[in-house]
Each structure stands twice: as C-alpha cells, then as structure tokens.
Amino acid sequence: MSQDVNELSKQPTPDKAEDNAFFPSPYSLSQYTAPKTDFDGVEHKGAYKDGKWKVLMIAAEERYVLLENGKMFSTGNHPVEMLLPLHHLMEAGFDVDVATLSGYPVKLELWAMPTEDEAVISTYNKLKEKLKQPKKLADVIKNELGPDSDYLSVFIPGGHAAVVGISESEDVQQTLDWALDNDRFIVTLCHGPAALLSAGLNREKSPLEGYSVCVFPDSLDEGANIEIGYLPGRLKWLVADLLTKQGLKVVNDDMTGRTLKDRKLLTGDSPLASNELGKLAVNEMLNAIQNK
C-alpha cells in the first residue's frame, strides 16, 4: 500500500557522504519531481545538417552548497533542466561539449531524474561519458573560443549547484564576454542565471545590465523550499536579488514554466521551463544560421 503524500516527512534527508549535509525531504521530492516531464516531441528533428555549430555546456562540478546555518545542501545540476533542453538541441543536429571549471566530473541531482521519460534518459545515456570526463573551461577558452569558434551557444543548466563557484569565476566571465562580443547565444534557467553574475566581476557595471531574465524565484528559496524541507536552511545569497543589483531585470516572481528571449540571452524560470526553453533555443539558433 502506497504511503499517503501527507504522511511523508518534511525533514531533509541526511547525506551520509558528508558532515551535516542533506538531500531534500521525501515530501518535497513528492511535490517537485515526477517520473515524466512535459516533453511533447521535437519540432525540428535533424534540421541542422552541416555539422559545424555546437553547444558549449558549463556544468556544475561541486555537489555541496554551504548554507547560513552551517548545514550543507547536497545538490548538483538538475537533470531535467540540463537534459531536456539538450535533447531538443541534439535531436535538431547540434553536438554538445561539456565543460566544468576544473574539468572534474559533473554532479547531478539524480533524485530528480524522471526515470520513465525516454527523452531525458536517452540524452543522459548519450552524454554520460562527457559528463564524467568534461573539458576544463580554461582549456576551452584557450583553444576553442574566438571569432571563428564552432560554438553557437553557451548553455548553463540550473540546480542549486549553479550558485557554487560559477558566479565568481573569471573563466565563466571570459566565456560570457566572448558570447556577447561574438553574437552567440547564452541559454540558462532556474538557478543557472547565477552564472550571469560573473559578467560583472571586478567591473563598475555588468555588460548584461538592462537585460531581462527569468530566474528561480527568491521567495521560494526563502520560504516554501525551507518549509517543506527541500533546503535544510537559508542560502547565503539569492540569485534574483544579486542579478537585480547588477542592473538586470527579473521579470518573474513565481514558477510557471516561463521562458524569455532578450537579444541572444534565452532564460527560463525553473524545471517547468525546460521543454519550452529547448524549443526556443533550437528555433533561435536555426534562425541565426539561416541569417548568417
């Protein structure tokens, strides 16, 4: 007999691999995860056939987020936020390269994996080797960026691990500078827009000042996520708050699956935006290729 959802614990689940670290509570996972996504098919299967243009994904290599109360949240990149947009891109014909800050393996929130979703699972299996042996971002910058680079877009998936290191990385800053200077796309969602904070490092103002973005609502990280035991405490800083202080305009204060295009910056508000963000990225990239 299945357990009633209201009987599930709202206490975060201890992660025995680390001191004072916790996974989300059973109750929160019942609310935030599902065996399938809203994937409803690929719109442009095989539409890109030339083979030149690729996607550079900057993924998280750190699992633990240290919180205000000294506890750690055991996290990673959210599998739906990573793999569903990539499914649309790969099925359209774009290859994907994976990079992390140090070249260490990508960390995923496997507890959020939709185990009955063929689109997500098949993409995970195709990328598994690259996720375990990613490129070092500094090497990508040195050897593969420039005006003639084969990367048409930079993709930064979410999951709370995106708030660790990536927002303070000079390598991420250089990558975003390159994308902006060379008219390439920046695609990100949920907590992934924390990476955009790096654009303002050691500068009087961010080159992204004035851009509009969707991002995971601070109000949920400050409220419901703690109340239902998804987070074991408060984050030390909030993504939307700091983006706003850098002059970006956060257009949402809720989680509805909203996506947004502002010039070459494509954003989504949460895992609920993964499917539509993937479609948006494919459409925009194909249009850009046609107009080159």
Swiss-Prot record:
The keyword DNA repair applies. CDD domains: GATase1_EcHsp31_like. It is an enzyme of class 3 (hydrolase). Transmembrane segments: none annotated. Pfam families: DJ-1_PfpI. The keyword DNA repair applies. GO terms for molecular function: glyoxalase III activity; protein deglycase activity; thiolester hydrolase activity. This is Protein/nucleic acid deglycase HchA. It comes from Staphylococcus aureus (strain NCTC 8325 / PS 47).
